[in-house]
């Protein structure tokens, strides 16, 4: 995500730990002015958020955007349902994928691309407990190898 003109706002690490991400999409987010200002300050959480497709449109629920401090009466509800902007063929493809048993749609990251707020969403399949244990074991092995390498270089 360290590309030119992209500023990461929030990352959903738990989604990558709990799911196998099969395919990702970039979607625009429909927001009001004070929500954008709050996002630019980095006050957003997508840990507990989830997505639904209703009437051919994708919505994000429980995405918490803290109220803008100077927003007074213009502030919206922090947990307001937000609409995502995707092409019709992308939505149809996602619907076909998540109708399969075990697949769901999860928010992965939210970021600013130039001046636009974008969300990376993924079609995901849930991991079993042993898959999570394997990931933890791999992470520990990698950490140990880096530690040994660092000691040898001194």
Curated annotation (Swiss-Prot):
Role played: Required for rescue of stalled ribosomes mediated by trans-translation. Binds to transfer-messenger RNA (tmRNA), required for stable association of tmRNA with ribosomes. tmRNA and SmpB together mimic tRNA shape, replacing the anticodon stem-loop with SmpB. tmRNA is encoded by the ssrA gene; the 2 termini fold to resemble tRNA(Ala) and it encodes a 'tag peptide', a short internal open reading frame. During trans-translation Ala-aminoacylated tmRNA acts like a tRNA, entering the A-site of stalled ribosomes, displacing the stalled mRNA.
Which keywords appear in this protein's UniProt record, sorted alphabetically? Cytoplasm, RNA-binding
- Biological process annotations from GO: trans-translation
Q: What is its main location?
A: cytoplasm
Q: Does the keyword Nuclease apply?
A: no
Q: Which PROSITE patterns match?
A: SSRP
Q: Subcellular location, in the record's words? A: Cytoplasm
What family does the Swiss-Prot or TrEMBL record give for this protein? Belongs to the SmpB family.
Any one Gene Ontology cellular component term annotated for this protein: cytosol
The beginning of the lineage is: Bacteria, Bacillati, Bacillota, Clostridia, Lachnospirales
Q: What protein name does the entry list?
A: SsrA-binding protein
The protein's matches in InterPro entries, at most eight in alphabetical order, are given as: SmpB (IPR023620), SsrA-bd_prot (IPR000037), SsrA-bd_prot_CS (IPR020081)
MF annotations from Gene Ontology? RNA binding
Instruction: Write down the superkingdom of origin.
Output: Bacteria
